[in-house]
């Protein structure tokens, strides 16, 4: 009997030894986790990339209100946004007087518009009101107001001051002939008249404000801040002239009778709500 028990104990010991040999020694949990990490290769620590100081849609020239909901009701500490940058001295870009919209004639404009090189004066980009009634045209180059030469925007304003209280003045211009070939200009004089209150004098303006980082839409003319303030708020945005209001609601009777207040542009329901 004792020999049978002894044989049974020895058999159990052999079985346990075989099982342990196949599975290997049981390691602590921490050691097993560490060995798995080593086997899987080194794990890089997370890299904290710097976040942009201002969102892409935010304008650095305008104050950015912190979001009180962020961070459990406390706003994150950030630097103050950039204020508008307005140089004390800016180049004059254009002038307006009695319906004239003019700008300085430059070598760049002469090349673009095919004028003879070396001309000086104020080039009219648009004429309305008294300027149009006097016979001036877009493209005319003002070179003299009465007896005062005009060579740049400042002299344009100064010359207009000399006739500010008068009701008429002689405007001498160079007008380009649009025939093909080498550019040819002819000099002519028109009389600018204002029936009431005098002619007044020209008002000068600078170039419009631009956003920081705006791409340059023209050739290089020096530093942007020679002509432009940088920021936002000096121009009405969006431009109302670029906004299209939705067409009004029309009745089914108008559609049935083909009452069109405009030329045919397609089916009425393409643009209008019909009731």
Swiss-Prot record:
Residue window of motif MCR 2: 250-274
Keywords: Biomineralization, Cell inner membrane, Cell membrane, Heme, Iron, Membrane, Metal-binding, Oxidoreductase, Transmembrane, Transmembrane helix
Keyword Membrane in record: yes
Chief subcellular location: membrane
Remaining remarks: This bacteria makes up to 20 cubo-octahedral magnetosomes of about 45 nm in diameter which contain membrane-bound crystals of magnetite (Fe(3)O(4)).
Phenotype when the gene is knocked out: Cells have a weak magnetic response and make magnetosome membranes. Has fewer but larger magnetite crystals. Makes small, flaky magnetite crystals, does not alter subcellular localization of MamC, MamF, MamI or MmsF. Deletion of genes mamH to mamV (amb0961 to amb0978) gives cells with no magnetosomes and no magnetic response.
Identification of the protein by name: Multi-heme protein MamP
Functional description taken from the UniProt entry: Involved in redox-control of magnetite formation; oxidizes Fe(2+) to Fe(3+) or to mixed-valent Fe(2+)-Fe(3+) oxide minerals. May control magnetite crystal size and number. Overproduction of MamP leads to more crystals than normal during exponential growth of normal size; in stationary phase crystal numbers become wild-type.
Comment, domains: The dimer forms a pocket of about 8 X 15 Angstroms, lined with acidic residues, which may bind 2 Fe(2+) ions.
Motif extent (MCR (magnetochrome) 1): 210-230
Membrane topology per record: Single-pass membrane protein
Quaternary structure, from the entry: Homodimer.
One Gene Ontology cellular component: plasma membrane
Gene Ontology MF term list: metal ion binding; oxidoreductase activity
Gene this protein is translated from: mamP
